[in-house]
């Protein structure tokens, strides 16, 4: 039985994935439309440049279409697709390595020997040597994300930008919810430390 576009729009992701598994390009197109924004968030925040993000976005959906027949039954389509998106974006980052690596570790809260919080110091200079205060906050945060290790960055993107539940973020990154919670908290502390010094 053929379904029209309106009927397809009303179907669940899993039902659409089942139809796509049998070769329905129309069902897959609905899934692309439905999840393009989230996959774009993953690609844009995991890749260093817009060009890399666009390549990762395209490759994610090409890979998903190519592999949809192997989509594991009983698995959430969203989890499966976002895992492909994250793997694709991380692979893109690996290909584009060669950029200097910086760390936001200095922006984590510091404590003295007695366990008291130590006040942060001064202003931070970004990677180009300009004062961060002169940059747009979005640019500062994007640069800051570039300085965070890939696994912590991935956890942060899934939890705080896509607002996925801990269990789903853990399934996408194939790790425990506890690790996701810890990594996300660590990134929040680093970003807060950075922003507090602006």
What are these language model-derived features?
Residues 2-6, 21-30, 40-59, 177:
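Short, charged helix-capping/linker segments at alpha-helix termini
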Residues 21-22, 48-49, 59-76, 94-97:
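Sigma70-family region 2
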Residues 94-97, 148, 153, 188-198:
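Short, Lys/Arg-enriched C-terminal cap helix and immediately downstream tail that follows
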Residues 32-50, 67, 145, 190, ...:
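Amphipathic, Lys/Arg- and hydrophobic-enriched alpha-helical face
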Residues 69-73, 83-104, 113, 134, ...:
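Arg/Lys-rich amphipathic alpha helix in sigma70-family domain 2
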Residues 2-6, 110-146:
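Acidic, proline/glycine-rich intrinsically disordered inter-domain spacer in sigma factors
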Residues 142-146, 150-154, 162-179:
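Helix-turn-helix DNA-binding module
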Residues 55-62, 75-87:
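Structural recognition of an alpha-helix C-terminal capping motif at a helix-to-coil junction
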